[in-house]
Amino acid sequence: MEGRGWPWKRKSSDKATTEKPVVGIESTPVCSLSYLASLENQEKCKNTNYVQITMDSYTHMSRMEDQVKLFEVQVKDLKEKLTLAHSEINTKESLILQHAKVAEEAVSGWEKADAETLALKRQLESVTLLKLTAEDRASHLDDALKECTRQIRIVKEESDKKLQDVILAKTSQWDKIKAELEGKIDELSEGLHRAASDNAALTRSLQERSEMIVRISEERSKAEADVEKLKTNLQLAEKEISYLKYDLHVASKEVEIRNEEKNMSLKSADIANKQHLEGVKKIAKLEAECHRLRGLLRKKLPGPAAMAQMKLEVEGLGHEFTDPRAQRNMSQNHNAHIAKAEISTDHKLEECKRENVYLTRRTLEMEEEIQTLKEHLSARNNELQVSRNVCAKTLGKLKILEGQMHMFNNDKNAPKSNSRNLSESLSSGHDHHYPPSVTSVSEDGFDEEGSSSECGPATSLDSHKVRKVSVNGSSKPRSSSRLELMDDFLEIEKLVGSDPDGANSASKSSNSVCSRRSVEKQSSSKSSEPDEDTTTLDQLLMVLRSRINRIFESQEGISIDKIVEAARFSIQEMQGSSTKRMSSHLFEVTDETLEKHVDIQNSEKEQKNTKQQDLEAAVANIHHFIKSTTKEATQLQDMNGNGQLRESLEDFSSSVSKYPTGESSLSDVMLELSRISVLASNLNNGALTLKPHSKEIPVTESNDKVTLLFEESDSNPLGDTFAKTDHCVDNLINGDDSSCKSLLKEVEQLKLEKENIAVELSRCLQNLESTKAWLEEKEQLISKLKSQLTSSEDLQSLAETQLKCVTESYKSLDLHAKELEAKVKSLEEETKRLEMAFTTEKHGHEETLAKCRDLQEKMQRNETCENCSSSKLQPNQEKDIVSATEKLAACQETIHLLSQQLQSLQPQSNHILKSRSPEKKFQQHKASEVTPNSALDDLPHVHIIQPSRSVKHTVNPTVHAIMKSSSVSSSSKEDNEKHTRGLGRFFSSKSKNSAR
């Protein structure tokens, strides 16, 4: 039993040695019995042998005999005791046999326990290896942790400083931005309220304008329908003109044939030259009259100043929208210190507001202009219509008067009447070739019967020319030759035939036809014999023409006096039937003209009153406008010490107040207004609110209105014409010859004026078309302005969306800052939690170290117990058995505990083996040179970390994860070999101690 160690402390290689002590234990009782028998035989041999001894020895022996006796007694006692001991030994041997069986069973159990202990030893070795590697790793990790904590502390201090600086800077910046944004938000809210009100007003105005545009479009559609009607009428008129041209061509051919037959080309050329000179004179007169009528029309229509002003306004509008940078630069230079503090959104909003205001002003001004132009057009159309109707009626009446006057004068002046009747017969005979024209259409597109007589001036001109020629022809001396008389008649025929060709315009030819139709209508309506008179007159004219032709053809050798007398006689024969009828028509026409003249005078008075009221209202509006626009300028002049503008304003207001009473005239008011405009233009500092783009237009418009009304009130051509007609009627009633001549002259003048008026009417129509085109351009401008309004509204909405985006971005920044604060708090909590976990892990490592030390102490105790048990012999066997059983139980408990610990440590070891990094392998390979004992001694010192540092410094979760993964990484093969060698040394030293 001496050489046997504890089975749980022995290696698998010591199994052979453990079997020998077991055999010794089984043979111990047999050896003890043989030893006792040998001792008894030796004592018997000693008693039989005798030896001679001395006295000393005998005495000594006697003494010894006593002692021997005593010893024999003792031996007997001992024998008895031996017998008792033998009996006891036998009983004990039986017990020993039983114990041997039990020991065999125990040995088998011990062997099983040995195998289990070997497995446990191996597991312990692996666990100790893992512990050693973990301790080495922990030491390295502690070093790394110290470095990391130091670096983290440094980084954290730097980051804390940076964070504090950044937080201070951001808080100050945030406060500034917040204050600025609050101010801007307030301003923008006010601007939005204003913009909302402006937008509401604009929407209302746009709705009104859209309604107005719808009305204008309806009117335009009506006008287009009227234009189509006019086109159809024009086509019909063109057809009539083509027919008339054909007739003219035929007539010209006939005239050429007659000229060739009579061989009078030289004389006709001279006469044509004379006519050309007269025509030049007439053209000069007509041009003068045209200039006069143009002046009158300029007074009625917008003048060239107003048209130029409108063109300038349109050009200024284009410049404003194409290049608004100048105004922006001026405003930026004026408000430089404010513009630096404003953001781009404010600039955009201000620009949008300015553009909106400007566009609204422009649209209002354009609407006012359009309304005024429409009013002017309607007024001019009405006036033209009235003048057309009146002129048509007067033309018809004058035509009838002319015919009656010719017939009336025939009785008194026979030769004159003969020649005049001849010319009229020729002209009327020529006129029958022309077909009647279609009724004309007025400017407004309405067909009227009265307007069909617009075309009268051409016929009046023809008759005037014929009459002049006839008068000239009749005034020649009777002593002229037959050739001169033929020249006169040829001249009459040329005038009758070539007048439409000389006019060279479709309007004059159609006018002649229309005037003839109007005269025929009025004469037919006024007379009781509608168609018979015209037929009889035509027959008489044809008969007269045939007789005159016969006279010229048959009487070639007769003198001129006889030819004239024959023609005169033939005319007098045919005259008697128509004198009575003409006189009746004359008195009817005079009554009608008087009534018409009275009506016209009443209407003129009413028009004058309305014009005077309009003038007073316009002057009052101008006065109010000038006062409102020159307040700031007067204040600035008062500050500068110059009060000229205030004085001129006072003079202007006094002249305006005196104007309704008649103390001051309209020219005085306009002079004062011009002075104010000059003073306003001299102000170069820009303080005057009469801005060029928004205020000049109404002033010029009002000035044009006032001047137009003033000129219209000063001139009235219709009144003059009707005064002339009144004078003519009075002269007709008197019945004097001189008055008749003057009346004829006046009638001729009226015809000329009427022709000029017709020309001016055509020009007015052209002007009307141009004004319509201008109105269309203005409508296009309004559409452009509306599109620009919509674009400005889009810009405003974009600016509002940008503002909303900015506010939302600031809100998101607030939320992001709050999230960052929450993240910082969560990171601090995580650092605290990681520190707590670190402390718990440290305590766990300390507990494992304490357990390892306890196991080492237990192993040492077991070794000492084995040494003690080997020194003792048989008496200590029972104690050894008892202690062995106790130790077995304790060993089983420890095995159970170790198995539990191994199960708890096994997943950690697997994780460590899996997640080992190559860097930590290299570090542990370097650290493998250190002994395990030193590592075990250093472990408690490694895990001591100052709590203040760990509390102060926050650990990044990524860093913590890296540290955790590095702490849990597995060891390499070299580390395993190193730790197996260390454990082999450790257990070999223990086995040596147990062998001792």
UniProtKB/Swiss-Prot annotation:
One Pfam short name: FPP
Biased composition (Low complexity): 417-428, 503-527
InterPro entries linked to this entry: FPP_plant (IPR008587)
Biased composition (Polar residues): 471-482
Coiled-coil zones: 59-94, 133-248, 280-301, 359-387, 601-622, 737-841, 876-906
Region (Disordered): 1-20, 409-482, 496-534, 962-996
Keywords (A to Z) from UniProt: Coiled coil
PANTHER family according to UniProt: FILAMENT-LIKE PLANT PROTEIN 4 (PTHR31580), FILAMENT-LIKE PLANT PROTEIN 5 (PTHR31580:SF30)
Subunit structure of this chain's protein: Interacts with WPP/MAF proteins.
Family from the record: Belongs to the FPP family.
Protein's recorded name: Filament-like plant protein 5
Organism listed in the record: Arabidopsis thaliana (Mouse-ear cress)
Upper taxonomic lineage: Eukaryota, Viridiplantae, Streptophyta, Embryophyta, Tracheophyta
